[in-house]
Every structure is written in structure tokens, then in C-alpha cells.
A protein has these predicted regions:
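Structural/interface elements that position substrates and couple domains in central-metabolism enzymes
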Residues: 3-5, 57-61, 127
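Rossmann-fold NAD(P)-binding glycine/threonine-rich loop
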Residues: 42, 50-97
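Solvent-exposed polar/charged
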Residues: 39, 73, 119-122
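Short beta->alpha connector loops
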Residues: 26-29, 86-87, 110-111
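Rossmann-like NAD(P)-binding element
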Residues: 5-45, 51-55
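Generic structural signal for residues in well-ordered beta-strands
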Residues: 8, 80-81, 128
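Active-site-lining helix/loop region of Rossmann-like oxidoreductase modules
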Residues: 102-167
Length: 167
């Protein structure tokens, strides 16, 4: 695993080096990252962790598309998977809250890429849930927005998360 700063050469080098790229940048920075990484992302699994929020912290896209789908259009050679956007950062290392696993969703059109991300979610400790095709990112992004609104807007804090109960 390699963390990348904001230097353009570091972004290009890391994109070329990695098999899987986790895109955890502000939504407004996606175009610059795509331009900077260029074709180095072709053939890679790109995990879109972004939340499609505008500068005023409102949902930037509706239910006719998603940030992940728009990213896939910009990176036609990549295998985009929407994941981790519904989880606050402090829970990323264990996937748990108070000893209970949080749910992490993964939506994508490439079965192998999605299986890779689901395996990573399970390895971290999340209850990994296949959320279907990439178009279901249209539902995951508003869920991430709800989490942000509960945590920050309604001041419930970030020591919270979602858990899907199923049999």
C-alpha cells in the first residue's frame, strides 16, 4: 500500500505501480486526478470512495447518474467499483464499531474487480455486501451523504455507521 500526496508525478507513478487504486479525494478534484494519472489507470481496479458533494456540502448529482458512473466514463479502460463511501474514516482500519462489524457496500460492473474489493472489505473486518452493478452507486452516494449529514449536520458525531441486517 502506498499513500500519495498532491504531487502530480507521485500520482502518475503510483497509478502505474498499483494494481488497485483507492480514489479518496474531494469530489471536485476527480477531473484533475484523472488528467494527472492519465492512461496509467487503464486495466486497474479503481475504488471510488468519494462522495458526490458540491462546495456547499450538498449532493451534486441526483438519481440519474452517480459520481462513480461519471468516473467510469472518464476512465473507460479502468474497472470502477464504488465502495467505502458510507463509512467514516476512523472506522476504516477495523471495520467495527463497539465490537460489531459495520456494513461496507461495493457496487461495480466488473465481477472480478468487485470481488477484489469485497475481499478487501472482509479482510479489514467489515460485513461486505455486494450492492450490485455500478448504477447502484446512485443509491450508495446519497447513503454516504446521509451519514455525513447525521454525523456533522445533526452533530451526532462520526462514531457511528450503518449495519445491514439480513439472513
Amino acid at each position: 500500500m502506498r499513500a500519495v500526496g498532491s504531487e502530480k508525478q507521485a500520482v502518475r507513478d503510483t497509478a502505474a505501480w498499483a494494481d488497485t487504486v483507492v480514489l479518496a479525494v474531494p469530489f471536485g478534484a476527480i477531473d484533475e486526478v484523472v488528467r494527472t494519472a492519465g492512461d496509467a489507470l487503464a486495466g486497474k481496479t479503481v475504488v471510488d470512495v468519494t462522495n458526490a458533494l458540491d462546495d456547499k456540502m450538498n449532493l451534486a448529482l441526483g438519481y440519474t447518474t452517480s459520481g462513480a458512473e461519471e468516473l467510469q466514463k472518464k476512465l473507460p479502460g479502468a474497472r470502477v467499483v464504488k465502495a467505502f463511501n458510507t463509512v467514516f474514516a476512523q472506522h476504516m482500519d477495523s471495520g467495527h464499531l463497539d465490537g460489531e462489524p459495520l456494513t461496507a457496500f461495493a457496487a461495480g460492473d466488473d465481477a472480478a474487480a468487485k470481488a477484489e474489493v469485497l475481499a478487501l472489505e472482509r479482510e479489514i473486518g467489515f460485513d461486505a455486501v455486494d450492492a450490485g452493478p455500478l448504477r447502484n452507486a446512485r443509491l450508495l452516494e446519497p447513503l454516504g451523504y446521509l451519514n455525513i449529514q447525521l454525523g456533522y449536520g445533526l452533530k451526532m458525531g462520526t462514531d457511528s455507521g450503518f449495519r445491514l441486517m439480513h439472513h
